[in-house]
Amino acid sequence: LMSATSTVPTANPTAQAFEIRPLPGSVGAEIIGLDLSRGVNDQDFARIHRAHLDHHVVVFRDQRITPEQQIAFSRRFGVLQIHVLKQFLLANHPEILIVSNIIENGQSIGLGDAGKFWHSDLSYKELPSLGSMLHAQELPSEGGDTLFADMHKAWDQLPEHLRKAVDGRHAAHSYTARYSETKFEGNWRPTLTPEQLAQVAEVVHPIVRTHPETGRKALFVSEGFTTRIIGLPEDESRDLLAQLYAHSVLPEN
């Protein structure tokens, strides 16, 4: 369970000695020797931010942080976005979404099937998120893995005929794209209220986005939230998206 103490990082944290080690494979790095509960000064955060830009996924080993500390560190990256499923937000800390398959008194305490499909978090919003910060509390001995794919690399290695097919095109993204499908497979998805549906109205984004800091291009489609390619017949859109999805999750990505 997550602690609810009021401890927060100090206003002027001291520098910490830590190491950034790339993980095996095409994405990810682990940070060894950093204690997030002590707070992170600007110089140390600059290194973390650079690691995130370079490796896309950053793992902080052996952390013992409170919800307040997690929120405070998350805010270093930008304004936090509140998830639409308010039923599963942590009490008194709406910035944190509970992801759990635990049932208490016949009710799910969290979103139990998050990440069933490949997706980019909050791509269904007008302003997609920079990323998400996951804080593991209780894990199974095996299974339950979270997988990542490098969409920069997916674009870099996209065959030329597919590059031409998506050049300048946009795609629609919707939170409800596969919501009913997952809802009927398990008791994890509550029925959305009209207010919640209004918060996740369909949006349109370029199929290829350019990172504002690095200038690198990346594919921006996913089977979880992308519904169609604007301006293409339904069958052509479905076929092209299927090819993009398959390419995006090749082992080398």
Description of each model-found segment:
Residues 3-253:
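Non-heme Fe(II) oxygenase catalytic core, chiefly the N-lobe of the double-stranded beta-helix
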